[in-house]
């Protein structure tokens, strides 16, 4: 017999078999063929359409998937007899083919589980490869894809669980904070180009009021007034460990004070006022940056001991700014520092190379607010004045701008949180639509978490500083949970940013390096030796 005859014979058998199913109905077919008392043959059964006794017999026996030894009866029948053509076994898993399996509850459960498992596998495969089954190979127009994260079955439960929390967070209004302490500060200068607050890790707050320096501590309150002068104070700064207080005045006088002493140990005079001071945050050296009104930056090493006190001029930077320097800050380990000026310019320097800036970024207003991120070494935030009103974020390793945030107000200070992925900002002059004077934003979402309105209209926050404490074991300075803000209404307010607050963004993980990963630290340019430790 030819192969064509065999194919036609199979087709004829299938057609008659399907006709039988349709005529007798599926119920009759199931009860006759699959009933519990149905007779099951132990040998293959040939369907003869002309034989009424075999016309309604299912051509599948219970031994269909039973294995036979080589050379057994089944193999011989299949090879030597046409009885091997008595059954058609579909070798496909196509969902459109007719299933002839036993439709018991167990079979249905197995089919459903298999189908669900297959569907889950397909969804996981789509998610992993970022493709969709609906995509057409010959569709050349770019179709808008749905969110692939919604297709991953393993994410469905967690997404449903977090959906309420996410929506609540997105729809939640910023929190309002109340100060836990308020100090009067008569004659506090309302001047964007000065820096009149400094906190010592020993617990003292230095405040420049007109020509005087006041010291305040939690235990003693206002303690004493340092030497009076006829020239107003324009900048104050405590050294890293709090041993030295540097004071700059509008006439260019630079003084260095020791605790419990009534006269300065060192006094230097420069022409032009001193708007900002910044100590290098390390124990090994007392290096100080001095920002001048003419745009120059002086770099001093201060030798400070019981027997000797002197200031050594290390360098004078003249190629950074053309106008007054109003912002200076170091990164956490003293390897870089940044300066901002009234010439709308931000300059980034290597601490080991003072000859020229590493990068220069142009803004649209004077830049006073500068802050390096303590847990991401490559990140620098800059805040510009009333003609710009933007916070910009830069990568300190390649000089590229990462992001920016329009605040609608003059930015007077920025402080990164040492514990959470967020930063606080104080504002000066603002638009009518922007009323807050102090805010906390999440990073990198840039969502406003805290918004503090002014107690009286038309005031601005001019100066601010984060509190810190000295670790007696390591001798190092650690940031704490408060921010101190001086406003143009001659008040100084203390705000609590402690861990008990519910509005915080995600927490910075505990680390011994910057990222708890040598690979990431290598990418960030970190050699594993740092001079500070964040909790």
Swiss-Prot record:
SUPFAM superfamilies: WD40 repeat-like (SSF50978). Pfam families: WD40_CDC20-Fz. This is Uncharacterized WD repeat-containing protein C13G6.08. PROSITE patterns: WD_REPEATS_2, WD_REPEATS_REGION. The keyword Ribonucleoprotein does not apply. Keywords: Repeat, WD repeat. GO terms for biological process: anaphase-promoting complex-dependent catabolic process; positive regulation of anaphase-promoting complex-dependent catabolic process. It comes from the Eukaryota. It comes from Schizosaccharomyces pombe (strain 972 / ATCC 24843). GO terms for molecular function: anaphase-promoting complex binding; ubiquitin ligase activator activity. InterPro entries: Cdc20/Fizzy, WD40/YVTN_repeat-like_dom_sf, WD40_CDC20-Fz, WD40_repeat_dom_sf, WD40_rpt. Belongs to the WD repeat CDC20/Fizzy family. The keyword tRNA-binding does not apply. WD repeats lie at residues 189-226, 228-267, 269-314, 320-359, 362-404, 462-505.
């Amino acid at each position: 017999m030819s192969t064509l005859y065999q194919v036609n014979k199979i087709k004829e058998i299938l057609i008659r078999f399907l006709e039988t199913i349709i005529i007798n109905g599926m119920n009759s077919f199931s009860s006759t063929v699959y009933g519990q008392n149905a007779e099951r043959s132990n040998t293959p059964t040939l369907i003869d359409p002309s034989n009424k006794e075999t016309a309604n017999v299912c051509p599948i026996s219970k031994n269909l998937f039973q294995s036979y030894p080589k050379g057994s009866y089944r193999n011989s029948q299949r090879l030597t007899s046409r009885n091997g053509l008595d059954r058609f076994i579909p070798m496909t898993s196509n969902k459109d083919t007719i299933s002839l399996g036993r439709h018991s509850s167990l079979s249905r459960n197995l089919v459903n589980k298999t189908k669900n498992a297959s569907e889950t596998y397909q969804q996981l495969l789509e998610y992993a490869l970022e493709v969709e089954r609906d995509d057409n190979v010959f569709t050349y127009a770019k179709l808008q894809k749905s969110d692939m994260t919604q297709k991953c079955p393993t994410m469905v439960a967690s997404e449903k669980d977090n959906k309420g929390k996410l929506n609540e967070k997105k729809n939640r209004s910023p929190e309002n904070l109340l100060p836990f302490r308020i100090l009067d500060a008569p004659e506090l200068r309302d001047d964007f180009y000065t820096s009149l607050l400094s906190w010592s890790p020993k617990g003292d707050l230095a405040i420049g009021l007109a020509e005087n320096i006041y010291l305040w501590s939690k235990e003693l309150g206002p303690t004493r007034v340092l030497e009076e002068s006829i020239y107003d104070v324009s900048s104050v700064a405590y050294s890293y460990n709090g041993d030295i207080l540097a004071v700059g005045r509008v006439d260019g006088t630079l003084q260095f004070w020791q605790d419990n002493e009534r006269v300065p140990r060192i006094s230097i005079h420069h022409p032009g006022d001193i708007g900002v001071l910044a100590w290098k945050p390390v124990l090994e050296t007392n290096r100080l940056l001095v920002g001048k009104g003419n745009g120059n930056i002086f770099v001093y090493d201060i030798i400070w001991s019981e027997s000797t006190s002197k200031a050594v001029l290390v360098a004078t930077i003249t190629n950074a700014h053309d106008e007054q320097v109003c912002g200076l800050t170091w990164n956490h380990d003293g390897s870089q520092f940044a300066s901002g000026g009234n010439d709308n310019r931000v300059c980034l320097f290597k601490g080991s190379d003072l000859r020229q800036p590493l990068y220069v970024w142009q803004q649209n207003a004077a830049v006073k607010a500068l802050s390096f991120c303590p847990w991401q070494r490559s990140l620098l935030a800059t805040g510009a004045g009333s003609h710009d009103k933007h916070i910009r974020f830069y990568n300190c390793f390649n000089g590229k701008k990462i992001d920016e945030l329009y605040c609608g107000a003059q930015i007077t200070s920025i402080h990164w949180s040492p514990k959470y992925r967020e930063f606080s900002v104080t504002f000066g002059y603002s638009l009518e639509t922007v009323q807050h004077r102090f805010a906390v934003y999440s990073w990198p979402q840039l969502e406003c978490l805290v918004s503090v309105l002014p107690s009286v209209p038309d005031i601005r926050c001019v100066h601010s500083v984060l509190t810190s404490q000295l670790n007696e074991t390591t001798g190092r300075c650690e940031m704490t949970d408060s921010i101190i803000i001086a406003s143009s209404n001659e008040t100084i307010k203390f705000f609590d940013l402690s861990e008990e607050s519910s509005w915080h963004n995600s927490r910075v993980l505990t680390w011994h390096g910057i990222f708890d990963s040598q690979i990431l630290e290598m990418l960030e340019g970190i050699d594993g030796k740092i001079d500070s430790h964040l909790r």
